[in-house]
Amino acid sequence: MTELSPKYNPAEVEAGRYQKWLDADVFKPSGDQKAKPYSIVIPPPNVTGKLHLGHAWDTTLQDIIIRQKRMQGFDTLWLPGMDHAGIATQAKVEERLREQGISRYDLGRDKFLDKVWEWKDEYATTIKEQWGKMGLSVDYSRERFTLDEGLSKAVRKVFVDLYKKGWIYRGEFIINWDPAARTALSDIEVIHKDVEGAFYHMNYMLEDGSRALQVATTRPETMFGDVAVAVNPEDPRYKDLIGKNVILPIVNKLIPIVGDEHADPEFGTGVVKITPAHDPNDFEVGQRHNLPQVNVMNDDGTMNELAGDFAGMDRFEARQATVAKLEELGALVNIEKRVHSVGHSERSGAVVEPRLSTQWFVKMDELAKQAMDNQETDDRVDFYPPRFNDTFLQWMENVHDWVISRQLWWGHQIPAWYNAEGEIYVGEEAPEGDDWTQDEDVLDTWFSSALWPFSTMGWPDTDVEDFKRYFPTSTLVTGYDIIFFWVSRMIFQSLEFTGRQPFQNVLIHGLIRDEEGRKMSKSLGNGIDPMDVIEKYGADSLRWFLSNGSAPGQDVRFSYEKMDASWNFINKIWNISRYILMNNEGLTLEDAESNVAKVAASEAGNVTDQWILHNLNETIAKVTENFDKFEFGVAGHILYNFIWEEFANWYVELTKEVLYSDNEAEKVITRSVLLYTLDKILRLLHPIMPFVTEEIYAQYAQGSIVTVDYPVVRPAFENEAAHKGVESLKDLIRAVRNARAEVNVAPSKPITILVKTADSELEDFFNSNINYIKCFTNPEKLEISSAIAAPELAMTSIITGAEIYLPLADLLNVEEELARLDKELAKWQKELDMVGKKLGNERFVANAKPEVVQKEKDKQADYQAKYDATQERIAEMKKIKS
């Protein structure tokens, strides 16, 4: 047995430990076929850069789960991997190339992809280093990447199978277009932000010049693609105009007036311009009325030749030029400034352009129905907290067909080929012959990520051992911001292709926010690098903070004050451990367990030993129960209270009465209970703080704590009588301590303590444990009896079953206390005078902010209460003196 360092130093404790775990292969599945499997697939981080604090939280929760299950005897697999993150990674690499004055087009597809693979290798290494710093117990022998050949095979099969069922199709529809990345986006890749904008009101003159129809738009540059104006067929103002024409300003061409319910008589003028190639609602109107589709923009957001004199302009430049021209022509009615919601690309930040484009889509109605129906079966996915099941169902009910093609080079190239005759071939392998050209687009990143739980296990080969044993997975841990992005897609793809749900449980956590509750972002400059936190506090402190502040579905506020508290807690554990191990005298864990069994059987030890074992039992039960519900924050509070309050502040202090005595037999029992309880504490803590628990465990036991048994409740430790008795003992000691503090009597000063109880069992208990009471209260005189009469002047405390009297004359030097109270009274009078003067100033009351005035009134009330209380104490002291 070695000795722990005098001071807890996380850098020393954590250095080299992770590699030792890897070398010992303790993170791999046990291979025990009799053990129940428990598997988690890591939500694959994007290879776009370093991991942030949100990743640290997400992976910490997973590691807590998998470490506990491993200790509980499950055959655990935590499968790591990373996501190629198509648009995000390509954007990062293009940005790096731009700094060198190079574009991807300069390099060509193959050489550009070589650069992206270099980027991937660089950041995959960084991410794995971060995982190691966090202590994540993943099985690297099964590491996956979404562009691995095995996963690519799964992607191709899913695409082809869905295509053959008619659930993947190619067509020309309005999609979200990112002009910066020059690619299509799905609805959920669009972030809507409120921005300062305007409604531009314009007049479209009837063909006969008799009147004008007023329309409004936020995007006047799209008017070159207008092919109609619509009115509601039931709107009496315009019914007679349906079928006539208006003149499109600037372009001077005739476009028809159509009747369509899309036009709302209650909104604006009730007339809307119809631009089918640039608005999803207008596209639907165009389909109903067989209107042409006129696309007036290039893929980079500039205007094309159909915009006439505005061709080549950026869309926002064209907007201003168009408005100026309308004003010049007298067609601009007015500009109405307004804040409105505008879609932005999640990745590039560019304003998204609704645009007619030929893309590949997944038909969602049947897939969504399967997912919703499954939630009514025993094979459903359980969400924690349950309210997110409703969120999931709502999204599924309102889902649209999913645009899956992306105009990128980095990703899974769509397995579709075209020939000169216009034929399309879709297959897992390329068609024979040289006259076929593969579709240049790639699939949406989420298409491959949706297959992650089963493709990583070997699917489509369903006979491989990992797929048979570890799929469906047990639990998914992820943030609420990607329930639709990812969780829902994994569910419907898994149900479609494996017939099973991808995971049994989904633990949803919130976001990491700063101390002010703001979301961390680059723009605010409030992001926190978890590696910086680890360097200062250690991984265990960060993990404890992330776990202890965690409740399913809730956000967490990061603060350095909380990190200080985390470090202090671990330092407390370190110091307790040092005390126990320094007093251990060579006792082995096996000997301790044997002696503790005697305590449980009341064959050895004392009531405090029985009390701590009873409370340890309760702690194990409550922590395990809350872990099973993923209530890690609740479990953390239970552990904290037991370790700091019950074990350190009470039991460890109580043991000093024995350890400093000459009774060797009692010392052995006390050391045994200390070591046994410490061992169970370390095992309970290990899933949360693996490094420090391994370091301490190694001082008294062989092997690694990673694979030891997790604590279980032992019925023999249940002892309500011991629990009730020691809790009463603690209440008595606390009451005396509080009374001393109230009248500023030092703990070192002996005092008279009178305990009156009519409960004979309690009286016997207190008297039989009187040494503990004396040790903690320092009495000059201590009486415990049912016959005690209450002194006339005494501080009185009432606890369950007893009254405690501390005679005031014994507690105080009356003359000194009166002098002190006189000074205190003068102090409160001075404060009252000052605040009274301020509140008596009419100008202050009239001109100061209401909250400032109220603050002064609150001060006045507080000072008055303190003044009155001090006067009462003076009266009491004078009564004692007389």
Swiss-Prot record:
CDD domains, A to Z: Anticodon_Ia_Val, ValRS_core
Known EC number(s)? 6.1.1.9
What reaction is this protein's catalytic activity?
A: tRNA(Val) + L-valine + ATP = L-valyl-tRNA(Val) + AMP + diphosphate
Coiled-coil regions listed: 808-882
Motif annotated as 'HIGH' region, chain positions: 45-55
GO CC terms, sorted = cytosol
The listed locations are:
Cytoplasm
* Binding-site residues for ATP, renumbered to this chain: 522
Show where the record puts the motif 'KMSKS' region.
519-523
What main location does UniProt list? cytoplasm
Q: Biological process GO annotation list? A: valyl-tRNA aminoacylation
State the source organism's domain of life.
Bacteria
**Keyword annotations for this protein?**
Aminoacyl-tRNA synthetase, ATP-binding, Coiled coil, Cytoplasm, Ligase, Nucleotide-binding, Protein biosynthesis
Sorted alphabetically, which InterPro entries does this protein's record hold? aa-tRNA-synth_I_CS, aa-tRNA-synth_Ia, Anticodon_Ia_Val, M/V/L/I-tRNA-synth_anticd-bd, Rossmann-like_a/b/a_fold, tRNA-bd_arm, tRNAsynth_Ia_anticodon-bd, Val-tRNA_synth_C_sf
Protein role: Catalyzes the attachment of valine to tRNA(Val). As ValRS can inadvertently accommodate and process structurally similar amino acids such as threonine, to avoid such errors, it has a 'posttransfer' editing activity that hydrolyzes mischarged Thr-tRNA(Val) in a tRNA-dependent manner.
PANTHER family membership: VALINE--TRNA LIGASE, CHLOROPLASTIC_MITOCHONDRIAL 2, VALYL-TRNA SYNTHETASES
Question: What's noted about domains in the record?
Answer: ValRS has two distinct active sites: one for aminoacylation and one for editing. The misactivated threonine is translocated from the active site to the editing site.
Could you describe the subunit structure of this protein?
Answer: Monomer.
> Which protein family is named in the record?
Belongs to the class-I aminoacyl-tRNA synthetase family. ValS type 1 subfamily.
Protein name, please?
A: Valine--tRNA ligase
What organism, scientifically named, is this protein from?
Streptococcus pyogenes serotype M1
